[in-house]
């Protein structure tokens, strides 16, 4: 889908993905000390807003100008202290500037349900890793390729889906993996099969802008 198609999707529904944050993000990040976070394909900002309410400073980037405007409108209902921690930007995550607000890199990068052809996915994940501080955490979550046959919802094009094993093989050496698997998600129409990888940036050195 191009930006115009995403704009149309966000215009037609009040909240495309709902208001609550992603359950796996909440489960994992609740125990983390707050810092700088990057949310790629942030949509209407449900995850970015949740992080900001917990003290994180969050940069959210999305292709859809409509989604970003909705994210800003929703955030405006929050206390000033929360609103000031949010920086929403409209842009294509394959080329957009990732620089953190303090210029020192991110502690956490979210790539949640960001489905791209493999070459673009590799580019974006590498850029996200580059933007992290040493020991920073990328969280990659999406529809597993097996969901086409064994789950419900999500894209039906296998070229934009992936498995945890593929991600681990591709990014070994760049990440030290903490969690990898296929969580099952209950939906109104059945069970969806997801792919989840969480790791830490390997090696030392300064974070880059991506």
What is each model feature region?
Residues 98-108:
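A short acidic, Gly/Pro-enriched loop at the edge of an enzyme's catalytic core
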Residues 106-121:
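A short SAM/SAH-binding and catalytic strip from SAM-dependent methyltransferases
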């Amino acid at each position: 889908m191009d930006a115009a198609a995403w704009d149309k999707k966000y215009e037609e529904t009040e909240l495309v993905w709902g208001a609550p944050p992603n359950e796996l993000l909440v489960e994992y990040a609740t125990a983390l000390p707050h810092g700088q976070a990057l949310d790629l394909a942030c949509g209407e900002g449900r995850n970015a807003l949740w992080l900001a309410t917990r003290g994180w400073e969050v940069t959210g980037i999305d292709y859809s100008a409509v989604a970003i405007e909705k994210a800003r409108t929703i955030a405006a209902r929050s206390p000033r202290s929360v609103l000031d921690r949010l920086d929403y930007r409209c842009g294509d995550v394959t080329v957009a500037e990732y620089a953190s607000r303090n210029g020192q890199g991110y502690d956490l990068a979210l790539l949640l349900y960001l489905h791209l052809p493999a070459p673009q996915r590799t580019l974006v994940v590498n850029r996200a890793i580059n933007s992290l501080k040493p020991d920073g955490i990328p969280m990659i979550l999406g529809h597993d390729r097996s969901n086409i046959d064994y789950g419900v919802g999500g894209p039906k094009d296998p070229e934009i889906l992936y498995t945890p094993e593929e991600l681990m093989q591709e990014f070994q050496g760049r990440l030290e993996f903490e969690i990898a698997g296929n969580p099952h998600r209950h939906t109104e129409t059945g069970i969806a099969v997801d792919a989840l990888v969480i790791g830490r940036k390997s090696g030392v050195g300064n974070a880059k802008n991506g």
